[in-house]
Amino acid sequence: MKTEYQKMIAGEPYHPFDSELRALAQTARQKQAAFNEEVDPVKGMEIIKGWFGSTGEKLYINTRLMVDYGVNIHLGENFYSNWNLTMLDVCPITIGDNAMIGPNCQFLTPLHPLDPDERNSGLEFGKPITIGKNFWAGGGVIVLPGVTLGDNVVAGAGAVITKSFGDNVVLAGNPARVIKEIPVKGN
């Protein structure tokens, strides 16, 4: 039988107040507080590297970070985020190498049932977010549950990304749409 954690990361309905999940969330709150209070960026990145599911060696995240668990976040090499990054990781959030994230960006994997009786039962579920390499998100970008983005995607400030897109595109708007294709230079 699956644990509530196993159900959660698989995107199946789960009980968020399960004791294992509450303990994981409490640990995340403690690490989040330690990170957000740390003034030495080197020590701050050591907290992240020991906490998140996986990271590249080179990363920088400004403070005022908010997560659900942290352990379901996987960041590639050369990851940068400005202030106020929110990553609600009830399902895995995976971002490839060379990502630049503007201020006030949100990566949201949780979902709730549309039916009010189901929603009021307390069950929740989620969908993972997967983003390829060379992602650039302007300020205030929101990436919603279940989104997959290819390589070399640029999301303009304030974009709300509600569906998946392939490689080499510029996205903007609410909901986000392709406003430009990015020419690919030879390797």
What are these language model-derived features?
Residues 11, 60, 136, 154, ...:
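Short-chain dehydrogenase/reductase
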Residues 65-75, 80-149, 174-187:
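Flexible, glycine/small-residue-enriched loop-and-beta-strand segment within the central core
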